[in-house]
Amino acid sequence: LVARKLNLNEFEEWITQEQNGYKCQVPEYRNIAGEIKAWNPYHGWIPMVLSADIADMISKMPLSTSISELQDVYNSSDSTIALSVNGKLTEWFNEHTDFMPTKYQFFSSKSELYRIMSTVRNKILDWALLLDENGIVGEGMTFTDVEKKTAQNTQVINNYTNNFYAEVSEIDVQQGK
């Protein structure tokens, strides 16, 4: 609401994407570290043995889902989260690895979700403090013309995005061992 009243389009767009999920690229802080495991019908989820280049490339997974979904997953998981790997990546693994055709999941610590939520919280707090430092206080949620102009000239938030290899469409929560 404040971003809209101050005509801060970039910040308003960022908040909207955090609330509703990202449709395209995600900011760097929304990439989580983890590892992809293959399903073995006799042993369950097993680590994949991959070349260092490929392992590095797939050791990060972007999370485009809304911040509220991340909060729900965080609250309902114990220590490990598992993300479904999309069909194209599954097909690539099945064609280019020595594994028999199978399914794959990306495993990560739930602390990665906490890191994302903390980053969002900190960005909002930093933004509020920056507005206050610049004299933008908005008495009763009403902003003067001077406050609006000052807000337009204040650098608010920078999100840096990177390209990524796969889309996350489902988050499956599995308890860590």
Positions of predicted regions on the chain:
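Long, low-complexity intrinsically disordered regions enriched in small/polar
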Residues: V137-K177
